[in-house]
Amino acid sequence: MEQLLDNRYRVIKTLGSGGFGETFLAEDSQMPSNRRCVVKQLRPIHNNPQIYQLVQERFQREAAILEDLGSYSGQIPTLYAYFQSNTQFYVVQEWVEGDTLTAKLKQQGVLSESAVRDILINLLPVLEYVHSKRIIHRDIKPDNIILRHRDGKPVLIDFGAVRESMGTVINSQGNPTSSIVIGTPGYMPSEQAAGRPVYSSDLYSLGLTAIYLLTGKQPQELETEPHSGEIIWHRYALNISPTLAAVIDRAIAYHPRERFTTAREMLEALQLGVVSYPPTVPYQQPQSSPTVPYQQPPVVTTPPFATQTNTVAVSPGTAPTPQPINHNNSNKGILMGSLIAGGLIGASVVIGFALTRPNQPVTQTTSLPSETTISNNDTPTVEPSPTDTPETPISQTVTQDPTPQASVRFPINSRPFTTPIDSKPRNTTEPTTSVPQPTTPSEPQITTPVEATDRPSPEQAVQNYYETINQGEYSTAWNLLASSFQNNRKLHPRGYDSYLDWWGGQVENVDVEQVSLLKANADTATVNARLRYFMKSGRQSSSSVRFSLVWDADNNRWVVSGAR
């Protein structure tokens, strides 16, 4: 016999059933197209007429939230309707044609790192919006993420709030509360299992979902370090990059204070390759969570992706008492970074990288090694501080001290090296004098192609690049990037405009705290740098970046070919 719900929705088949009710695939008989939809039947777990009114009110409130969420994002199913019938509650939502991540893995095996990164990068902006509405999903897992057939986008389904309303009871104080905990064992963290979920609880679940996609292992199949609570999973995913591993590790940290504080922060870490230390400012507990005192870190984002609109903390009116956060376990937070800059919730990511300028007056007198790995201890790590550098005419070469020095801070409106006020434009020729060698007379200036030993060092190229940015000469800095980076639409969706939005609009200053040569030959070089960003918003963040440079013989300079 044909089943018709609410005299409208014709049931095609049952998609699933459980303690809360059943889920059907149905057709809307009152739509000309007989549009397919998902109908979820929910029943209260307590058959108590006294609390039925409370259940009804909470159900209506949560359904309204679902409507709001679905109307914003194409990656959350649209709510078509909700109704009640025979003490049961029904939600009618968009039918998403696609495969769950569980089904996808069963079809083709574990996913590649790039596929998992794409899923995370596409889902985190959705989670950011959900959290901005003070909603915690509470049941993120492979079964609740569908890869839509028509565009391959991940869609987040089955929010837990509506189901939770079915467990409404009256506590001993006479207040309505829920008698059930929403979530899936293994995918939900300890605070959620205790009935105190926070925003980072969703990030924890998403991190474990990523591990499942990379390894094929369910959380219950993974061991846990008994002292720290750390989940041991790296042995099952040996070929993934340290950056992705670090992002996942922070997302699944046992204590919420050690996780990313927001979906935006996790997204930036993925896009930039920068996993920062947890912030030291307290975070306010979301209103939708229970009122047991519990503290989550603040919304602090890591460069270079923050904007005024996407870093607003989502919190209730009453803040918990600020307490410092323990950083003992955060040493694994910072790994390798990439200099990707800019972005949006769906946004642009911009890379700022390094190379030298042909007119730079400071060069390194040591010869550039060929195909040699150089110890950090034997390589100049930073340019000497301005206070330690004697005033030198622009036409003189300064020998760089091979001993690591203090970090150099380049103010926006000042140069780190002393030059005459009426110095020539940036297209001025190279200095024509050089420091004589002790045993041989100075060689005359030559016009033939520059040999490798006369080139500016790759380390100096990194410092010069940030000097250019700190002076606000963004177009010059942009032209110091390799064309492959300029034209990479994943990094610069709008080309130079994306680059300028980040460096000109968000960053106040960048300190080059340390720079060292890893290896080099006549055509390529690899440089490690430690950077500190000073944002116009007042925030600070550090990152470690590994630059790959290639020699641009036409312009006698190093240009960046990669960074991570």
From Swiss-Prot:
- The reply on keyword Nucleotide-binding is yes
What reactions does this protein catalyze?
A: L-seryl-[protein] + ATP = O-phospho-L-seryl-[protein] + ADP + H(+); L-threonyl-[protein] + ATP = O-phospho-L-threonyl-[protein] + ADP + H(+)
- Biased composition of type Polar residues is found at 360-406
Keywords attached to this entry: ATP-binding, Kinase, Nucleotide-binding, Serine/threonine-protein kinase, Transferase
Active site (catalytic residues): 139 (proton acceptor)
Q: Which InterPro entries match?
A: Kinase-like_dom_sf, NTF2-like_dom_sf, Prot_kinase_dom, Protein_kinase_ATP_BS, Ser/Thr_kinase_AS
Question: Which family, according to UniProt?
Answer: Belongs to the protein kinase superfamily. Ser/Thr protein kinase family.
What is this protein's record name? Serine/threonine-protein kinase PknA
User: Which species does this protein come from?
Assistant: Nostoc sp. (strain PCC 7120 / SAG 25.82 / UTEX 2576)
